[in-house]
């Protein structure tokens, strides 16, 4: 009996180890995407690049909530550099670091900061939330801000300890996360005070590090502008390199009006401050909590949404952080925003199509490529075509196109449309069609037969497959690709 029990235990342990070490499973949705290429000659596939500390980047990925153990770095870290991002967002976790007054335990955070650097990714850090050893303001997303006094004094000591420990390692500090979350919409004056005091403490220790304000989630500009005015009244705009916002909108293109108006308003108060899209993403299932809940998402829609969102905000010139590396276990739900699908133990099950989509964007849209509004399209197809021009070294090299008038659907079918592209003079060059979801690169040579330049700096394409997901029309010279 004992021998049988021991044998079963040994087999069970062996099976567990084998399961923990085996590679992630293939993804049914990804295989289906790859089986439905655009109806154009396939010539290759985007060549993905791993993260590299020496290479500047527009792109970041979220490694949040590990301060509350909703995810575990060791279980997914190997996949972070495969995304090709330049940066990763961490949360500092005051409550996890200082569980006894005045005693800081940084080992857990060291593993994340140093681990990312070893993987070729620059960490940036959101300083948050409250700490129950000092108050009941909360240590999670709904944490309340605190005024000057003993709690603030303890916070400032903690901030200085963090800045000292990670000087030269963390590239930017973000002060708090979503202070305007839910019922805290009248806390902008408290936030302005917290930001200025925190920013001064950081710069006292690390004069060179970047500082980011707000991490706002409110769809209204009022909170941001009220907080910024409060920061300005306290002489704090000099510390504000970036203002971050979290753009969770069902139709990503709907944010454009909001962000452009916010830029104009900020230019009158904080003209030297840039905007940063600091956290957003789409769920992979219909969720009953958190952002974008109540919509029938799936992994096709998720990947399309994230691609559209990345191009929308990059198209306005804003750096972008995608939420998030892995599914998060909140206890009361598994949040499905992850590039990696995980089980209840937080172990990777498979890489979602969203993972590959992010790889494709970081590979093609490098730091030396910039958005330009010099390109636009004309079409009578009956759909709103969103267009973002691509520029390198002052030269227009292509554009991204997609249907941007609705929430993305689950279909893998494209619509053949006729359109005119203004602002590109590339018809005699070797243009290719890059599917940003699959990473497939297709030839466009046959698409131009019988059609020349309609006028200087413009050309027409009689039949181009488009859908509700970005494709890029680009000179082949600028496309890193592996040949088919």
Label every model-predicted segment.
Residues 80-240, 247-250:
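Substrate-binding cleft and catalytic face of glycoside hydrolase catalytic domains
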Residues 420-441:
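Solvent-exposed beta-hairpin/edge-strand motifs
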């Amino acid at each position: 009996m004992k021998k049988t029990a021991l044998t079963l235990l040994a087999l069970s342990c062996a099976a567990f180890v084998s399961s923990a070490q085996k590679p992630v499973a293939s993804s049914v949705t990804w295989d289906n995407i790859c089986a439905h290429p655009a109806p154009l000659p396939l010539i290759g596939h985007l060549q993905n690049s791993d993260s590299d500390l020496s290479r500047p980047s527009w792109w970041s990925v979220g490694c949040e909530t590990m301060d509350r153990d909703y995810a575990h770095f060791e279980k997914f870290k190997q996949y972070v550099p495969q995304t090709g991002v330049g940066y990763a967002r961490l949360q500092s976790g005051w409550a996890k670091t200082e569980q006894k007054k005045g005693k800081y335990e940084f080992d857990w955070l060291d593993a994340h900061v140093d681990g990312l650097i070893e993987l070729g990714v620059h960490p940036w850090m959101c300083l948050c939330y409250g700490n129950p050893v000092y108050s009941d303001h909360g240590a999670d997303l709904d944490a309340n801000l605190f005024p000057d006094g003993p709690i603030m004094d303890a916070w400032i000591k903690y901030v200085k300890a963090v800045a000292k420990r990670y000087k030269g390692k963390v590239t930017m500090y973000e002060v708090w996360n979503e202070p305007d979350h839910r019922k805290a919409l009248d806390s902008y004056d408290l936030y302005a005070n917290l930001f200025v005091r925190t920013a001064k403490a950081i710069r006292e220790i690390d004069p060179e590090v970047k500082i980011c304000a707000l991490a706002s989630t409110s769809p209204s500009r009022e909170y941001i502008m009220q907080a910024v005015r409060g920061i300005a009244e306290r002489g704090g705009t000099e510390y504000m390199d970036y203002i971050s916002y979290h753009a969770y909108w069902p139709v990503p293109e709907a944010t454009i009006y909001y962000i452009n108006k916010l830029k104009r308003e900020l230019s009158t108060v904080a003209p030297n401050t840039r905007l940063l899209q600091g956290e957003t993403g789409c769920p992979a299932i219909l969720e009953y909590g958190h952002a974008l809940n109540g919509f029938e998402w799936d992994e096709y829609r998720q990947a399309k949404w994230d691609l559209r969102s990345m191009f929308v905000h990059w198209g306005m010139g804003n750096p972008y952080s995608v939420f998030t590396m892995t599914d998060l276990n909140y206890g009361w739900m598994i949040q499905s925003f992850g590039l990696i699908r995980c089980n209840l133990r937080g172990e990777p099950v498979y890489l979602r199509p969203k993972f590959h989509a992010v790889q494709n964007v970081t590979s093609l849209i490098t730091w030396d490529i910039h958005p330009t509004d010099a390109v636009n399209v004309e079409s009578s197809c009956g759909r709103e075509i969103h267009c973002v021009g691509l520029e390198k070294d002052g030269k227009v090299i292509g554009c991204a196109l997609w249907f941007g008038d609705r929430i993305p659907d689950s279909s893998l079918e494209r619509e053949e449309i006729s359109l005119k592209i203004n602002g590109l003079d590339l018809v005699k060059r070797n243009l290719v069609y890059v599917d940003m979801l699959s990473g497939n690169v297709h030839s466009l040579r046959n698409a131009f037969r019988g059609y020349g330049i309609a006028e200087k700096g413009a050309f027409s394409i009689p039949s181009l497959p488009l859908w509700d997901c970005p494709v890029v029309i680009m000179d082949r010279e600028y496309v890193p690709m592996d040949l088919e």
